[in-house]
Design a protein with these regions (language model features):
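Non-catalytic regulatory/linker segments of enzymes
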Residues: 1-410
Length: 410
C-alpha cells in the first residue's frame, strides 16, 4: 500500500522492508521484531520442506516421520514434533493477529456485493437531490462502462451510505449533501478498483469517509481530488505526536521526506519525481491535520489556532525543503560548491507570516539576497533560484500543485 507513493518500500527483501517499517514508526518495535522472527522461522522451514521434497512447495507434510525430521532440522536432534508445531502455530497466529489489526476491522462485515433490488433508490424524502443524481446515473454511459464487479461495489456503497446517513440521525439537508459528495467521490474513483475495494472491504474507512463528507465540503473536494488519501481513513487514529509534540512530529516528517527525495535525486536530476513527492507529502499532512481539525481520530477537535500552527509549519517545511533541493542545481550551473549556504532569504507576509495559514491560503513571499556592490552576477543567480523555487511550488504535475504564490509587495 505504501509502495505506491513511497519508493523506499519498492524493494524485494522482506527484512529490509520490515526495518523501514520500524524506522518510519509504522508499527511498534515489538511488532516489527515479532514479524522478523516469524519471517526467519517460516523461511527456514520453507527451505527445509523444499529440500526434502525437491520441489517448490509450501505445504507442511502430514507424514509424522517427516515432521519429526523437520523438527530436528529446525531445533536439534532432541527436538519434539509437538514443540515444533507449537512454535509454528505461535508465529502464524502472531502474523495473522498483526495483519488483522493493521486495518482495524473490529469484527464488522464487509460490503455485500449482491445486485441491488431492481427498484432500489435513495429515499425521496431524505435524499431528494441524490435521488435525481442516482436516476441520471442508472443506465448512463459511465455506469455501463464499468466492469461488473466495480458496478456492484459502486451500487452497494451508495445503498450502504444512504442507509447509514438515514439511520444515524443526520439532518435531512446535511444527509442529502453528504450523499451527493459521496457520489462525487465514487465517480472519481469508479475506474480505480483498488480505491473502491478500500471502501468495500473496510467498513471503518467508509464510516470515516461519511463523517468527513458530512463535516466539510472543502474536505470532500480535497479527498475527491486526491483519492490516494483514502489510505489514511483505514485507521482513523491521528498520530498523537502531531498534537502533543508537534516539533518532534515535523522533524520526523522532514527526515522521512528527505530520505524519499534522496532516493529519487541521487542518480541525476529527478526534479519531476521530487516535485511529486513534495506534493504527496503536503496532501498527506494537510489531510491528517484536517482529520484532527474535524475530530476524526482524536479525542477532541484541534483548536483553530493549532490548525493554523500545523498548516504554517507544513508550509515552512515545504519551503525549506524546496530551497534545499533547488539550490544545488543553481550552484552547479554557476560552479559554486553545493555546500555553500547562499545569502538568500525567504520572507513570508500575510497568513503565513502571521502563522495563520488556512487550508486554501496562498503564500505571500518576498525573496531577498545580499551581495557585494560589484557582484554583477548575483542578480542573475538569485533571480534564477527564486524562479525555480516558484516553479517547484506552483507547477501542476500528475499529483497536482502545492501553492499559489504572490510575490507582489502591497
Amino acid at each position: 500500500m505504501r509502495g505506491g507513493t513511497d519508493p523506499r518500500f519498492r524493494v524485494r527483501p522482506t527484512l529490509e522492508v520490515l526495518e523501514l517499517i520500524h524506522q518510519c514508526k509504522i508499527l511498534p518495535l515489538d511488532d516489527v521484531l515479532a514479524l522478523q522472527d516469524a519471517y526467519i522461522f517460516l523461511r527456514r522451514l520453507e527451505h527445509r520442506i523444499q529440500v526434502w521434497d525437491d520441489q517448490q512447495t509450501h505445504y507442511l507434510p502430514d507424514d509424522q516421520e517427516v515432521r519429526a525430521r523437520l523438527a530436528q532440522s529446525m531445533f536439534g536432534e532432541n527436538a519434539e514434533v509437538q514443540t515444533f508445531l507449537e512454535e509454528l502455530d505461535r508465529h502464524q497466529n502472531k502474523v495473522a493477529q498483526l495483519f488483522g489489526q493493521a486495518f482495524q476491522l473490529d469484527g464488522e462485515s464487509r460490503l455485500d456485493l449482491t445486485p441491488l433490488a431492481h427498484d432500489w433508490k435513495p429515499d425521496a424524502t431524505h435524499f431528494p437531490e441524490s435521488l435525481v443524481r442516482w436516476q441520471a446515473w442508472l443506465g448512463g454511459s459511465k455506469q455501463k462502462q464499468l466492469p461488473e464487479k466495480s458496478r456492484l461495489i459502486f451500487d452497494n456503497l451508495m445503498r450502504q451510505a444512504a442507509e447509514r446517513l438515514e439511520a444515524d440521525g443526520t439532518p435531512q439537508l446535511s444527509a442529502d449533501q453528504a450523499l451527493l459528495r459521496f457520489f462525487d467521490l465514487l465517480e472519481a474513483i469508479a475506474r480505480r478498483s483498488a480505491y473502491l475495494s478500500i471502501l468495500a472491504e473496510y467498513p471503518k474507512a467508509l464510516a470515516n469517509v461519511l463523517e468527513l463528507l458530512k463535516a466539510s465540503q472543502w474536505g470532500a473536494q480535497y479527498l475527491t481530488r486526491h483519492p490516494h488519501l483514502l489510505d489514511h481513513l483505514l485507521n482513523s487514529r491521528t498520530e498523537k505526536t502531531l498534537i502533543e509534540r508537534p516539533q518532534e512530529y515535523w522533524l520526523e516528517v522532514k527526515a522521512s521526506l528527505n530520505m524519499r527525495l534522496d532516493d529519487v535525486m541521487a542518480d541525476g536530476d529527478g526534479s519531476e519525481q521530487a516535485m511529486d513527492i513534495l506534493r504527496v507529502t503536503h496532501h498527506t499532512e494537510t489531510f491528517i491535520t484536517l482529520l484532527a481539525d474535524l475530530g476524526i481520530g482524536v479525542d477532541s477537535p484541534l483548536p483553530l489556532e493549532k490548525v493554523s500552527d500545523h498548516l504554517s509549519a507544513l508550509a515552512d517545511l515545504i519551503l525549506q525543503t524546496t530551497f534545499e533541493r533547488v539550490w544545488p542545481g543553481i550552484a552547479q550551473k554557476f560552479e559554486f560548491s553545493k555546500d555553500l549556504t547562499p545569502p538568500f532569504a525567504i520572507i513570508s507576509y500575510g497568513k503565513l507570516g502571521g502563522k495563520e495559514l488556512g487550508y486554501a491560503s496562498d503564500l505571500d513571499l518576498v525573496f531577498l539576497y545580499e551581495s557585494d556592490e560589484n557582484d554583477y552576477a548575483a542578480q542573475e543567480i538569485y533571480a534564477l533560484l527564486a524562479k525555480r523555487m516558484i516553479n517547484w511550488l506552483t507547477a501542476f504535475t500528475s499529483t497536482g500543485s502545492l501553492f499559489e504564490i504572490d510575490t507582489r509587495l502591497r
